[in-house]
Regions:
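A short helix-to-beta-strand connector/capping loop
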Residues: 2, 22, 112-115
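Active-site histidine-anchored catalytic micro-motif
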Residues: 93-161
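Conserved small/polar residues in nucleotide/adenosyl-binding loops
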Residues: 167-172
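Cationic, low-complexity basic patches in intrinsically disordered or flexible, solvent-exposed regions
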Residues: 177
Length: 178
């Protein structure tokens, strides 16, 4: 059984300590607020982020492009004799999943003895993080890449996401949950 590593996106909201402890690789999906770009490596403090949003600033996000994904995959494969399982941000919310599939196909042409399996989590934030968490548990229990990918494909449909949408009305300056 060939060793493999788990890659996911910074959209999982997993704690940095967890990522480091379990040797996860992160695909950075940057965001921009008030003209400044932020990444996993260079984040804006959470309180500052929400304070700016309360004041009316809106962040924009950027998907991973195939070149960025290929660079990450190649850096992993050059350093390690492993396969890759990438649990990607929802294809319904970003083009990153498709960029990663394109990159995986290109990189596998250069490394024909390696596999890169990209799973569309159909999830975001901690929903995606829960899938990563379970993949880590399964890997630590001795499951192989194919078994974990199959589990993810079957179980990603059982996640429920709840969101609280905040808005300001003309009649009130305070935020309200709808």
């Amino acid at each position: 059984m060939k060793e493999f590593v788990i890659v996911t996106d910074t959209t999982t909201d997993l704690p940095r300590e967890y990522v480091e402890k379990h040797h996860l690789y992160m695909m950075s999906l940057p965001y921009t607020l008030e003209g400044t770009s932020y990444t996993w490596e260079n984040p804006m403090p959470v309180k500052e982020f929400y304070d700016k949003m309360r004041a009316g600033s809106l962040p924009t996000t950027s998907q991973a492009n195939p070149e960025e994904a290929a660079t990450l995959y190649e850096s992993i494969l050059k350093e390690n004799d492993v396969d890759i399982l990438h649990i990607a941000f929802s294809s319904g919310l970003s083009g990153s999943f498709n960029s990663c599939r394109i990159a995986a196909a290109d990189v596998c042409e250069k490394y024909p003895d390696r596999r890169i399996v990209v799973v569309d989590s159909l999830a975001a934030t901690l929903g995606q993080g829960l899938l990563v968490y379970k993949a880590v548990q399964l890997k630590e229990a001795g499951k192989n890449l194919d078994e974990i990918a199959a589990w993810l494909e079957e179980n990603k449909y059982h996640l429920v996401h709840n969101f609280c949408l905040l808005y300001t009305s003309d009649a009130a300056d305070d935020m309200q949950c709808v």
